[in-house]
Regions:
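NAD(P)+-binding Rossmann beta1-loop-alpha1 motif at the extreme N-terminus of oxidoreductases
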Residues: 2-82
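Residues at the starts of beta-strands that form the adenosine-phosphate
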Residues: 25, 48-50, 134, 161, ...
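Internal alpha-helical scaffold of NAD(P)-dependent oxidoreductase catalytic cores
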Residues: 156-241
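Short beta->alpha hinge that forms the Motif I/post-I loop of the SAM-binding pocket
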Residues: 54, 91, 115-117
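Hydrophobic Val/Ile/Leu positions in short beta-strands of Rossmann-like dinucleotide-binding domains
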Residues: 27-28, 89, 164
């Protein structure tokens, strides 16, 4: 359902964004299935990547496999600041707010993207902190039922759609302002991140993304729950009006 927005409705400021770009060092916060798989892809491509994992055991396991991982968030973000790294937030939605506050404290100069499956709540947290200029939302449309570093694998995103939001550009253009070059560069970096991971970048607005994901991803779960309720009550004829 996301595919319908590939070539329509994109702001003029990003129409020329294309071709390969050089990724800066990439700092991944949260190394579960998605974050860990991104780390594996970037490492396999020979790019500079390091990260933080809340789970000490997960961080140790990743380190034993040869990846540059720490369980010290402030130290990792301070390093990202020194490197002017691209920060990828790959934690559950309930942890995003604390991560953003830590980024504001330790890496206020870094560009930020995320991989959270719903974009509006993240966008609201970004706006509340005045971070729109250095944020481009993302959502790789791939995954498995497993979680944690042990579930991550190289190639998880091959041929997957990777939604990339452009709402800040829309807001600038509606206000008659030029979209800052720094933001356009960041948008290009996130597109390149998707490409390196084998995915296809799909520009989309926050609202259109969430509408599409609700139809494609969440509706089956709602239907499954409804069917379970029907089954518990003995079939369709027994469901209360």
């Amino acid at each position: 359902m996301i595919e319908q927005h590939r070539t329509t409705g994109n702001p003029g400021s990003i129409a020329h964004v294309g071709g390969r770009r050089t990724l800066p060092a990439t700092c991944i916060i949260g190394l579960g299935l998605i974050g860990g798989s991104i780390m594996r892809d970037l490492s396999a491509a020979g790019l500079s990547v390091y990260g933080y994992n809340h789970s000490r055991s997960g961080a140790r396991t990743a380190s034993r496999e040869g990846f540059d991982v720490s369980d010290d968030l402030s130290r990792v973000l301070s390093r990202a600041s020194s490197d002017h790294a691209l920060i990828v937030i790959a934690v559950p939605m309930h942890a995003v707010e604390d991560v953003l506050d830590s980024i504001a404290m330790y890496a206020p100069n870094c560009g930020v993207t995320d991989v959270v499956s719903v974009k509006k709540p993240v966008d609201e947290l970004i706006k509340a902190r005045g971070m729109q200029l250095r944020y481009v939302g993302g959502h790789p449309m791939s995954g498995t039922e497993d979680s944690g570093w042990g579930a991550s694998r190289e190639g998880l995103f091959t041929r997957a759609a990777w939604a990339i939001t452009y709402d800040y550009a829309i807001e600038c253009e509606k206000a008659g302002r030029r979209v800052p070059d720094d933001w356009v560069d960041l948008f290009g970096q996130v597109c390149e991140l998707a490409r390196v991971c084998g995915a296809e970048a799909v520009p989309v607005s926050v609202d259109k993304h969430d509408e599409a994901v609700a139809r494609v991803s969440h509706l089956p779960h709602v239907l499954a729950e409804a069917l379970a309720v029907v089954g518990d009550r003995g079939g369709v004829g027994r469901v209360d009006a």
